[in-house]
From Swiss-Prot:
Predominant cellular place of this UniProt entry's protein: membrane
Name of the featured protein: Lipoprotein signal peptidase
Classification via InterPro entries: Peptidase_A8
GO MF entries: aspartic-type endopeptidase activity
Catalyzed chemical reaction(s): Release of signal peptides from bacterial membrane prolipoproteins. Hydrolyzes -Xaa-Yaa-Zaa-|-(S,diacylglyceryl)Cys-, in which Xaa is hydrophobic (preferably Leu), and Yaa (Ala or Ser) and Zaa (Gly or Ala) have small, neutral side chains
Family listed: Belongs to the peptidase A8 family.
Domain of life: Bacteria
Keywords for the protein's UniProt record, in alphabetical order: Aspartyl protease, Cell inner membrane, Cell membrane, Hydrolase, Membrane, Protease, Transmembrane, Transmembrane helix
Originating organism: Bartonella henselae (strain ATCC 49882 / DSM 28221 / CCUG 30454 / Houston 1)
GO BP, sorted A to Z: proteolysis
Active site per UniProt: 117, 136
Spans through the membrane: 8-28, 61-81, 93-113, 128-148
GN (gene name): lspA
NCBIfam families: lspA
EC numbers on record: 3.4.23.36
Amino acid sequence: MTRKSFPFFLLGLILTVGIDQAVKYWVMHNIPLGTETPLLPFLSLYHVRNSGIAFSFFSSFSHWGLIFLTLIILIFLLWLWKNTQYNKSLTRFGFTLIIGGAIGNLIDRICFYYVIDYILFYINDVFYFAVFNLADTFITLGVIAIIIEELLSWIKRKSTFSE
């Protein structure tokens, strides 16, 4: 990590956590728990509480156990961000999104003992995806960003070796 990159990292965290928490606040105060608000033929806002992690995994863990697990993962992610080469900007951006999303969900878990989820994708009455939130979306987009940069690096290395 360089001093030059830290302000961008901090700004990214402030934006991801701030947007996530603002939307969750709006959902909590405008959509009753367990109520679905259709937006599009395949998308609804559906206010639920998730006591686990993604897809309700680890929902049998204690409240403090999940907080501890999240903190350990955050420390590891911060270490990865800090030790990622400066020229790997997409990877660094990906880690920023992942860390911001994890912090957003950690705030919920500390304050409410659960995570506020509200995004529901579905196809008619045939398929319903797990309800999730914007923090989960940031985490997913961060992983995708890292995978893209790794694939591009791999393709570049492969083409360099074959020449």
